[in-house]
């Protein structure tokens, strides 16, 4: 178990490499063209800044 104390970072790198390979493999399976054709409509953006930002910080144009 002494080697685990010295080389724990190798195990972490192997784990991260495995996660990265699985992510790449899963992303290759995604059909982006099919998703873009069937994507849901987004609701309109609602901005509530107009309710509290009454003061005008910009200089007035003459």
From Swiss-Prot:
Biased composition (Basic and acidic residues): 36-51
Biased amino acid composition, Acidic residues: 52-62
Main location class: membrane
UniProt entry tagged with the keyword Membrane: yes
Residues passing through the membrane, by range: 4-24
Record membrane topology: Single-pass membrane protein
Disulfide cysteine pairs (residue numbers): none
Keywords, in A-Z order: Cell membrane, Membrane, Transmembrane, Transmembrane helix
Coiled-coil ranges (or none): none
GO (cellular component) term, any one: plasma membrane
Domain of life: Bacteria
Pfam family, one: UPF0370
Localization terms from the record: Cell membrane
InterPro entries named in the record: UPF0370
Region ranges (Disordered): 36-62
Family in the record: Belongs to the UPF0370 family.
NCBIfam families: PRK13664.1
Protein name: UPF0370 protein ESA_00777
Source species: Cronobacter sakazakii (strain ATCC BAA-894) (Enterobacter sakazakii)
């Amino acid at each position: 178990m002494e080697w685990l104390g010295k080389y724990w970072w190798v195990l972490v790198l192997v784990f991260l490499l495995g996660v990265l390979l699985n992510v790449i493999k899963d992303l290759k399976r995604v059909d982006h063209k099919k998703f873009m054709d069937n994507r849901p409509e987004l609701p309109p953006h609602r901005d509530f800044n107009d309710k509290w930002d009454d003061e005008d910080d910009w200089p007035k144009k003459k």
